[in-house]
Amino acid sequence: MINDIETLRRALKRGDYCGIVLYEGPSRIDGAPIVAIACRITEASGNAKTGAMVQTFIMRQDIAPHEALKTGDDSSVCGDCPLRPIHKGATRCYVRVYQAPLSVWNAYNRGRYAIPGVDFDAALLPKLFEGLSFRIGSYGDPAAIP
């Protein structure tokens, strides 16, 4: 277990981990299993609009995001958003779930995200994120997590 902030930052920069798991548990929307993940902690995003921001993804633990979108199980993380494709004729969400969200979900399922209390001391989180800007909900509604 990593117990100091510099070692954790080095592990993230080296690519030992792709990011940090912020939450694993039931959705506050419907109780289904979800995960919240923070990425791009030590490096800038390639997204010119967001730049150097920590990206957060809130998604189902048990169903790939593109599959959840097809079946309507995305409601666990998107609630009753009018941009969900289940609403026929509505403007569709701009998030391409088969791109970044699917990549994050696949990496999560391969164990590529550090888990507080397992891989590193959870007390390091405030120091790790100190001074960083966040894009809350790059995919998923933050209301789904406590």
Regions found by a protein language model. Name each.
Residues 1-146:
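Class I S-adenosyl-L-methionine
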